Amino acid sequence: MGLSDGEWQLVLNIWGKVEADIPSHGQEVLISLFKGHPETLEKFDKFKHLKSEDEMKASEELKKHGVTVLTALGGILKKKGQHEAELKPLAQSHATKHKIPVKYLEFISDAIIHALQKKHPGDFGADAQGAMKKALELFRNDMAAKYKELGFQG
């Protein structure tokens, strides 16, 4: 399930574009997540009241959380699968405090792919998309394994 060096390079190349403007990418990812899967909004007390895309775009809190999410994910992706130290506290908080089901990690992975396709159509071709999907699947599988260790059946 691991990625080749070439695949990791594709992932990190596109991630460089994300890091050039994390706030707008994070906002795009979260809006895509909430529009595609409105049930995920229920896990976010500070966003539950946001009903329209315009309200979401106007929310500084949402933008700030998008930065938090993508900054954490970027730190994990840069480890090229050697992300145990970064993953452990994330799995702990998402399993025990936030109670985020693994399925929701799949939903946000799809939202990340969608946001990258939308924002970087010329730089996110089939090879880069395939590599990013593999990297996000590796992340999700490792999160699921940590959830299991913590006794969370999310």
Curated annotation (Swiss-Prot):
Keywords: Cytoplasm, Heme, Iron, Metal-binding, Muscle protein, Oxidoreductase, Oxygen transport, Phosphoprotein, Transport. It is an enzyme of class 1 (oxidoreductase). Residues 2-148 form the Globin domain. PROSITE patterns: GLOBIN. Heme b binds at residue 94. Its EC number is 1.7.-.-, 1.11.1.-. One of its GO terms (molecular function) is oxygen carrier activity. O2 binds at residue 65. GO terms for biological process: removal of superoxide radicals. GO terms for cellular component: extracellular exosome; sarcoplasm. Nitrite binds at residue 65. It catalyses: Fe(III)-heme b-[protein] + nitric oxide + H2O = Fe(II)-heme b-[protein] + nitrite + 2 H(+); H2O2 + AH2 = A + 2 H2O. The modification Phosphothreonine is found at residue 68. The keyword Cytoplasm applies. The modification Phosphoserine is found at residue 4. Monomeric. Marmoset, woolly monkey, and squirrel monkey have a minor myoglobin component that appears to differ from each major component in having Phe-Lys preceding position 2. Monomeric heme protein which primary function is to store oxygen and facilitate its diffusion within muscle tissues. Reversibly binds oxygen through a pentacoordinated heme iron and enables its timely and efficient release as needed during periods of heightened demand. Depending on the oxidative conditions of tissues and cells, and in addition to its ability to bind oxygen, it also has a nitrite reductase activity whereby it regulates the production of bioactive nitric oxide. This is Myoglobin.
